UniProtKB/Swiss-Prot annotation:
Superkingdom of source: Bacteria
Keywords of the record: Cytoplasm, Hydrolase, Metal-binding, Nucleotide-binding
Any Pfam family matching the protein: SurE
Primary location group: cytoplasm
InterPro entries in the cross-refs: SurE, SurE-like_Pase/nucleotidase, SurE-like_sf
Class of the enzyme per the UniProt entry, highest EC level: hydrolase
Organism annotation: Sulfurimonas denitrificans (strain ATCC 33889 / DSM 1251)
Name of the molecule in the record: 5'-nucleotidase SurE
Signal peptide: none
Length: 264
């Protein structure tokens, strides 16, 4: 029986990273790939579902659909409820995203949200992102393809390494052709603290009306005290592959007793 993999992303069905992922997966033996991806780019859409308008599947190719006009979470939700009626896929992969998804950026990420939706439905899931070298805006996904194939083979021949409602968040370092990254190794990391700064830009149209563009602040992270290991950001800075276990439970357990005392 073939190993079934559901694929989605947040860059849209025409994205180079998605095509690179599908190509890599189809090179594996006994694997069946189904793609359901947004009809347009949904970067930073978070874990949103579309509840205010209808959605429809549009066939692009064999086992390849775009969802007009849905989010990654919509894609996974509807794929699991309409395509995989009799049995769930063995694995879900969201990506390959163009750009990193590290630290608190995970909460914005449509790529991570695709994996979140998967584990909500008890489907083992991976989110994979390619950290970009902006001197090469098109990106090179060769290393990401190699990594995802290694992970899928390991999972397919063994088991998924995480419990329910946890997914793997994978970030791939840039500069594939550099000496530093040829020997990139997989490193288990924690999610770093992202440093954010206001990067909104005001403009005026020909009628003098104001409008805004939200910019992307450069990757910058704050140190975390009392945490053993290294962060996703530190692994990438060292030219390594970051693999972070992410859980959906956002409860702040360390603060519960303090909160009880405060309430009493």
């Amino acid at each position: 029986m073939r190993y079934k993999i559901l694929v989605t992303n947040d860059d849209g069905y025409e994205a180079k990273g998605l095509r690179a992922l599908v190509k890599a997966l189809k090179e594996l033996e006994d694997v069946e790939v189904m793609v359901v991806a947004p009809a347009s780019e949904k970067s930073a859409c978070g874990h949103s579902l579309t509840l205010v308008r209808p959605l429809r599947f549009v066939g692009v190719d064999d086992n390849f659909f775009k969802l007009d006009d849905g989010t990654p979470s919509d894609c996974v939700y509807l794929a699991l409820s309409t395509i995989y009626v009799d049995s769930k896929p063995d694995l879900l992969i969201s990506g390959i995203n163009r750009g990193s998804n590290m630290g608190e950026d995970i909460t914005y990420s449509g790529t991570a949200a695709g994996a979140m939706e998967g584990v909500l439905h008890d489907v083992p899931s991976i989110a994979i992102s390619q950290v970009m070298d902006f001197s090469d805006p098109q990106g090179d996904f060769t290393l990401a393809q190699k990594v995802i194939k290694e992970l899928v083979i390991k999972i397919k021949n063994g088991s998924f390494p995480l419990p329910q409602r946890e997914f793997l968040n994978v970030n791939i370092p840039p500069d594939l052709d550099s000496t530093d990254n040829r020997d990139a190794k997989m490193v288990v990391t924690y999610a770093g603290y992202r440093f954010y700064a206001n990067d909104s830009h005001i403009h005026r149209n020909p009628r003098g009306e104001e409008f805004y563009w939200l910019g992307l602040h450069p990757l910058d992270f704050l140190p975390r005290e009392g945490i053993k290991g290294i962060s996703d950001y530190e692994a990438i800075e060292a030219g390594n592959i970051s693999i972070t276990p992410i859980q959906l439970d956002m409860s702040a357990y360390k603060s519960m007793n303090k909160l009880k005392e405060w309430i009493e």
